[in-house]
Amino acid sequence: VAALAAYGNAAETMRQTRPECNLAWTTLAGIGHVETRHGRYRGASLNDDGYALPPIIGIQLDGSPGFARIPDTDGGELDGDPEFDRAVGPMQFIPESWRKYGVDANGDGRADPNQIDDAAVSAARLLCENGGDLSVAENWQRAVLAYNASREYVMDVRDSAAAYSVGTTAP
């Protein structure tokens, strides 16, 4: 429930601040589902304050088959890894993207990728900046590719978002 509320809030935030983006909450829900099952990856869950516990830290992005090679960009500050970057939180932000798009959306004075409200609005910012008008299919696809440069990922997000848009459970 916390994740869905965060996606709705993030879409509303974009409607007010970047109405030309036309971001649907279902796109964020699709990404949240594909990335971490809305903060429930590997036994994690969102607490009452919207934090993923235990924190969700992705695999080392060391260029292993199927994964990008991203040498460390933050001295391990965000992801705890001083050698390679790792995606962090329920929306799986890499440190470089978090530095660019991360915002405090829950009003606690701290932008934190492990907090679902912060992560959802930050994801919305990334999508809107990279896609423009997301009601245009090509722009939506470009935005999701900016989130994760994989055609399979785009299709998975599309399928999940479509399921949410008609009120069914994501695949």
For every predicted segment, state its role:
Residues 1-171:
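Catalytic glycan-binding domains that act on GlcNAc-containing polysaccharides
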